[in-house]
């Protein structure tokens, strides 16, 4: 398994040969592309004492949730550790949470926490419907896109629409090398580790 990858933009393509790869733009001109090294770890997929991986991933939720919380919450000082946030909080008056499937249900739950802990107005949208409505984009709204894999097609399409309108976009994903993470202006990884089953536990966390 390789840990090197090159991302193609829309219209670009490549020809894979025995010992090298050639990249071209949509006009057919040869171009140079950067090769990136992914932060992948060689993990052993072991069920341990569990009968199957689903039981294992469900039982591991408390540990996974703890890892995610510890990444962003300083429990000793009762503070939030989110670094390099690109906007001032005074520039944000509302939040729109966008997701599909179980990620959408996670957004519904997150709405209650936002309203409980902040004074922000919060809306939740199903990604598949978001881009078909007549959206009134607002510069003071933070659009948060939730996707475990970071590759959910409808969620990415909603993100792309927001980017076209130069909105504030944030990704909540498990895979930091994913399309949604790469094209969002800010990323909050949830640090769930490798998911074999893609059950709803990763999105819910």
What are these regions (language model features)?
Residues 1-89, 103, 116, 130-136:
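N-terminal segments that mediate ammonia production and transfer
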Residues 133-138, 179-181:
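Short glycine-biased active-site loop of nucleotidyltransferases that positions the nucleotide triphosphate
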Residues 124-133, 151-153, 176-177:
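Short acidic loop-to-helix transition motifs that present clustered carboxylates
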Residues 111-123:
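Short helix-loop-beta junction
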Residues 198-205:
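Conserved small/polar residues in nucleotide/adenosyl-binding loops
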Residues 92-98:
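Short glycine-rich phosphate-binding loop at a beta-alpha junction
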Residues 118, 139, 182-184:
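Short, structured coil segments at secondary-structure junctions
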Residues 7-18, 143, 147-182, 186-197:
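Phosphate/diphosphate-binding loops
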């Amino acid at each position: 398994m390789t840990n090197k990858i090159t991302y193609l933009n829309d219209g670009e393509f490549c020809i894979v040969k025995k010992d090298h790869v050639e990249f071209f733009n949509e006009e057919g001109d040869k171009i140079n592309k950067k090769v990136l090294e992914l932060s992948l770890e060689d993990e052993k997929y072991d069920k341990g004492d569990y009968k199957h991986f689903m039981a294992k991933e469900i039982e591991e939720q408390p540990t996974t949730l703890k890892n995610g919380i510890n990444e962003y919450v300083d429990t000793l000082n009762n503070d939030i550790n989110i670094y390099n946030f690109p906007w001032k909080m005074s520039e944000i008056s509302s939040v729109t949470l966008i997701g599909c499937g179980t990620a959408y249900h996670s957004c519904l739950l997150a709405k209650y926490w936002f309203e409980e802990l902040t004074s922000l107005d919060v809306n939740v949208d199903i990604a598949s419907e978001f881009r078909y409505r007549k959206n009134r984009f607002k510069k003071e709204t933070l659009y948060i896109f939730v996707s475990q894999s970071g590759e959910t097609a409808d969620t990415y399409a909603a993100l792309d629409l927001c980017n076209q309108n130069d909105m504030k976009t944030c990704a909540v994903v498990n895979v930091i090398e994913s399309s949604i993470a790469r094209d969002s202006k800010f990323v909050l990884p949830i640090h769930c580790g490798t998911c074999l089953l893609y059950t709803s536990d990763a999105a819910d966390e």
